[in-house]
Each structure stands twice: as C-alpha cells, then as structure tokens.
C-alpha cells in the first residue's frame, strides 16, 4: 500500500468529465474542472450539428489541445461528434453508400404433396438474392423434419428472382440481403436515425478513419500523442432488433459480400449449403455451424474495427479505448458482435458503460466481463462511461449517494477510470461561462467523490481480483442457440437467455452474500490460465468439447466443478456424467463461503495483492464482525484503522472498505 498516494492531494486517478462543447473562455473552464477535483476530460473536434470534420474545426480543436497541454489537464479524444462511432459524422455512407450495414434473411418453401412451380421475386426493401438451394425431406417421418442437407441442389437465380420447382418432400431455401437498419440500434439510439457502416467491411472502417481521424492527425499533430486514449462509442452490427415490442418481416444475420469466401478460407468448408442451420435447428450440425459462424463474425469485427483503428492509432502514438454496445448480457455479446470479448480485446484498453446507475438495480455481471478481459489483456483495469440514463428521476433524487455506490461497485470489480456524463454544477463556479450547468454534483460532493476514487485506486490500483471461484463464460452455448428473430425479444425466451438468467441468479445468491466469482472462458480453461479452487458452469445446454476435457483435468487436480440444473452436452453432441456434480446456486453458496458468513448485501472481492474489497449495498449501516486482525482503509473518511479479530465495525451504506490482513506483531499495542 502506497500511503503517499492515499494521502496525496493530487488529481491523478480522479473522475474525468465527458466534455463535448467548450466555452470560449478555456482557462476558466479548466479552472472550474480542476476546482471541483476532477482529473481531466473526454473531448472532441467541435463539429457543428449536422456538420463534419474540417480544417477549420480541427484548427479550433488544436487550440483546445494546446490549452489543455499548457494547463496540464489530461484528455481523451472522443472519436467523432456523433453517435454511434463509425459513421464519420454521416460522411462515410454519403461517400460510399455501398458500405452500409447488411443483413441476410431466409425464405423457406416446402411441399408435402403434388408439384408446384413458381418464380419468387424479392420485395422492394431488399437488395439481392445471394444463394438458393433445394433439399429433400424424409416424408416417412410424420413427426419430425428430417432434411438431407448433404444432398442439396443449388438453384440458379438472378439478382431479384429465382424459379422454384418443388415435388412432394422437397424444400427450397432462398437467402436474401437487405440493409440492416429498420428496428435496429440505427433508429433507437437517441442521436440520429441514419444508416450505419458494415463492420464486416474493412473498407468501411478505413473510410471512417479517413473522414474523422486523419484530419486530426494532419491538422493537430500533437493531439494523438498527447491524449490519454481515444474513446470509441458503441459500434455494432445492426442486425439485431432493439425493441421487444416491435416486429419486422426479416430475421437477419450479419452479412457482407466477401463473407462466404472468407468463411471458407478460415473454417475450411463452404457455409452456403448449411445456411438454413443458422436460422433453424433441423440438423444436429447446427451447434458447431453456429459456433463457427459467430466466432468468424467476431474475428472479422475485431480485425476490421477495433484492430484496424487501434493499429492506425499506434502509428500516431495513441491507444484505442471506449466501449461497445450491450455489455450486460451474453446473448447480446453474440447478436451485436459475434464475439464481444474478442472485439473488446482487440482495442488497447477495455471499457464499458453503465446506464443503470442505481445500486438497487445494477447489472452485477457486466463489470465482471470487463474484469475478465482486463486480466486477459494484462491492463491495470478498465474504463467506465458513467451515464445515468434509465430511471433518471430516481437517480437524481439522491445523485451523490447513487454515484458513490456505483463507483464503489465498479472499482471493486476492477474499473480504474470513470468518464462521466453526469456533470457537476459548474455554474456555481462561473455562471457566465457555464449557464447550462446548474444541475448535478455540488463542488463539495465532487471533491468528496474524486477523493474517494483516488484513495480506492491507491489501495487497488496495480492489482486485480483473484480468481478463486471461477464462473464459466459459456459463449459457445449462446452461439449454438443463436437464431435471428423478427423482434428484439431474445430475453423473453428462457432457452435463448438460459445462461444469462442463471448468471443473474448467481449474482443474487453468491455475490450478494459475500462469495465472489470471476469469469473465465474456454481459452482460459483449456490453456490452464486460471488456478481456481472451484469452477461453476451456469445453466446451459452445451459446452465446447475442449471445455469438457479441461473440466475433467481441473477436477482431477482437486478443483471442484459445479453444474447448474443438469449437465450439458458438448457442442459435438457428447453426453457426459463423469465430471463435476449438479447443484443449485444456494448449495454452491453454502459450500463456497465455508465458515465465514457476511451479512446479506455485503459484497466481498479478494485481490491478488492480498487486499480484500468489501462493499455494503444496504441502505443502512451494517455491522461487520472481523474474522482476522486487519488494517481497514476507509476511502470516504480518508481514515486507516486497525481492527482486532472478533472486533465489530459499523460500515456505512453504499461504501467500499479495503481490508489488509495484518499479523499480531504489527500491532504497536501487542505484547
């Protein structure tokens, strides 16, 4: 523990403001931000509404950068004055409309008697047909759909038409491309209703770099080398629908014109004859096919977007961070990116946002996914964009306490930077310069918040949560189940959201009762990259075959393996009963917390540096009985206390304490 950092008055590791629009008086603005205890800002080229990056506004941005440099204020660069990142102030698609996001949908025609011949013509909302094929169904089975996908016949087609001739027992599938737009995040994002770029097309991202980032490098060469990091904001594939209450005519999977050839080159087989299995489960090969497909999609998004922008920024002396869409649920990790973890890992510094900013309504697993990614990348933690969006009126009713609570949770789970959209009352500093900033945190609250997170960083910075109990991040199960919907109602299906629902239950039962877990994925288990005492597999239908073998190895080494509800089968269809045991979350809790029981709603996270973070999510003070002698760091009060074994301490609500186990000889009164 570095007591200089604990006691130091500096602004390092305090919160940053998301500051998009600067007043003319830059010095007064910087003075105010510093006076409220904040560290720095996330800012951008001052593009007017509906405008684009130009030499003139880059010149203005250069003046801002020079002033920030002169005043010693750290800054991040927000990659565009617009949202979501990637459309380049709407310039990319204005130049190249062919680079818009695309989706592939299926039309199916089957015949059980007689013969039928017709021409199918696509509708006016669609672009073109890209594949059509006919298969034979076994009509002797009057219960199930038994289709011979190995004996398919490709059908000739034009851009808009295909002639289909069916005999009894034949099925035709037609695969059609259209814009991924209606009902997507394109039209439900609070910023614009413009179409978005195709993340499967590397040229689309190159065009974004040309439109938005290259002008900064040319007109303000110091900007990228000086900035902390570049902040990108929620790019996505746009093929999933955003609202559960809307329905559309097309269930879409991600598509680009190069997709079939690239898939074949990477996975070693032709995707096209098996395309129906991305939409329906009429052959047991659907599980492996979908895992291969969504893994491929994740690879391409990671390379084209995060990887390409990161590589370009490295050439400018900068790094990529920011955050991506829908961190909270694994099913959205698949629908929005194919493989969310791979995409985030391809940036330099992982990040997330938090829109539910109430300790009573918190997505507890979301920061834990980022903690896993941070561990994999070897970063000191991750960034959080703090944005009270949902239930804002409840947040505002007690904003300071809610902010302190969320900061406690986030830092406990590994966050090391907070960039906030919840602003302080800078109008109190200078009403002429900040006429619109009369709401938010007061100066006293801002100073207290910033001192709080700086002291937490002094204790936990440079370390990470320990992986003693591991929760399996079962992406393969979600991939294997993934089929496109005509609505954003995935979460309403207990089958598609089985893993997410199970993880929510574990957060409620384990985390809220003092038993921490950290996520580990197939790569971690197969590679032996974690050394836990227990592995929990949440409720699921499938695990990767390699994961099954890894679980057997871990159990042979003495690690406890728990399955939830029942044992799954492997993606290849293997059933197994020779590893682990089946039990529920309550039974896992009883076993994993041993003899030590914390009060309900007290969260405990051990760290690899020997520290233990303890957070009280109760609305009142909670009495803790100290098990072992410990030094206790209270980052809100700024106090350090020695507590003996068996001593009791009252912990305030919504606060984090850090415990450091000490030996008796360290007690100056001992002996």
Predicted regions and their residues:
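Histidine- and aromatic-enriched segments that form or immediately flank copper-ligand environments
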Residues: 36
